[in-house]
């Protein structure tokens, strides 16, 4: 498979709350591991999966072509804030309940990720809003 994205950053929800989530995550990570790509994890992540090369933040943002977020909309927003200044595309895999922003389901993961890696995708620019009330950031 010829991939447009070869250096894949992984961003995982801090606390996957049940074994079904962990089982789905492990299955998706195994699918990725079988492709001709490299998987990276930012050292600030709590997940230390053996399939990932762990990089410090500066190396990570220089190395990765795309970040795949495993979690819900909140996890995707956390990743967007963390990588805001680096122009790295972010792909959200919905492991939460809502999925407005992370609209790719775990059931469609394998088909979708192959299409994305082959270049069959469209990158959408999104805005991130910040607000301040008094001295408090919201």
Task: Write out the residue ranges for each language-model feature.
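Short, structured patches in soluble enzyme cores that scaffold and shape functional sites
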Residues: 12, 95, 133-135
């Amino acid at each position: 498979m010829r991939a447009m994205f070869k250096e894949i950053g992984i961003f995982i929800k801090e606390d996957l709350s049940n074994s079904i989530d962990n089982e789905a995550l492990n299955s998706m990570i195994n699918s990725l591991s079988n492709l001709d790509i490299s998987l990276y994890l930012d050292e600030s992540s709590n997940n230390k999966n053996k399939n990932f090369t762990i990089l410090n933040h500066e190396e990570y943002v220089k190395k990765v072509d795309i970040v795949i977020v495993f979690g819900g909309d909140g996890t995707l927003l956390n990743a967007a804030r963390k990588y805001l200044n680096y122009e790295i595309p972010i792909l959200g895999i919905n492991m939460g309940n809502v999925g407005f922003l992370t609209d790719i389901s775990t059931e469609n993961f394998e088909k979708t990720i192959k299409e994305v890696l082959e270049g069959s995708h469209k990158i959408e620019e999104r805005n991130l809003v910040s607000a301040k009330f008094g001295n408090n950031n919201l």
